[in-house]
Amino acid sequence: MANGAKWDATNLPIRPGLYANFVKAAGKAVLGGARGIVAVPIFTYDGGKAVSGKFYTIDAASDGIDLVGNANATPITRILEGGAKEVLVYAVPALVIPEDSSKQFIDLHEAFAVQDFNVFVYPTVIDDTVQATTKAWVSECRNEGKHFMYVAGGDAESDADIVTGNARSVALKDEYIVNLVTGVVLLDGTEVQSADYAPHIAGLIAGTPINKSITYVELPIADVTLRLKNSQIEKALTSGSLVIVKDGNKVRIEQGITTDSNATERGKIRTTRAKQAVATDLPAAARDNYIGKIDNEPNGQAALIAAFKAYLETLEGENVLTDPRVALSSNFKSEGDKVFIDVSYEDLDSVERIFLTITH
């Protein structure tokens, strides 16, 4: 069953299902699903109960320790501390041929591709080749109707040079990808590289309602490993980097953006997650209530349109989006077993910049 996969008018899909084309406004849905699941592959799980090649759902840090061992559970704990509802853990099989690490990542991507989750993150540092492979995987999944965010990070060396972190953001440019470029200092003084803190950010994104932004969210840490000047922060933002800043006695996320950003426009995590929710919920509702169950005639089409519109109006009422519109397509004829519906809405963002003119 297709689940919001892309469609092409010159090569229509064969399988029954709902297919979505995003034209800078998007396909939509009908019943909000759980959005707080973070997926993480764990490569070392000695001392725990995990079995190689198996998936596990964790909702408590103590269960994570039991599963993968105390020494390996930090990524799971950080995801939950960030606010995720659940952690989908995959016990990655050990390499049969040590030199063939690329196959290990390809295989784990294939394993995760058929699981349900909202945000993906690695437990620690990966190399540039795997980053590129993961970016391609995110895009491939999106084209097949699987929508999730990927949170990336770097090692301590790249955290010490914002130019390097920004270059990674540019290389990972995608509306579904977030790149953390700031290492952090925990409350106990421990320095943590951005790749190791990325699980906390993944949990924060997953646990934040889709009508809220993570911009200026305060983090439970003491400092960052590299404080940036204003000009450096601005350059990082236009490069698509997620930056953490020391703001007086607080440490905050500067702006909740994706790597799909430039000098004039920032891709927002909030609007991307709203789009993903719509693209995920609509196919589920269509599959459960409409596909194969209504006639392709005016009354059946009207029922489908009304359901889609009602869902979007619910999101509008929750300040997720504005101005939803649903109608039969005027460009394609709905006949046989095919229905073409145009859905549009306006993104709703948070107030993030306030400009004052003070006269005295």
Task: Locate the predicted segments by residue.
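Surface-exposed assembly/interface segments
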Residues: M1-H360
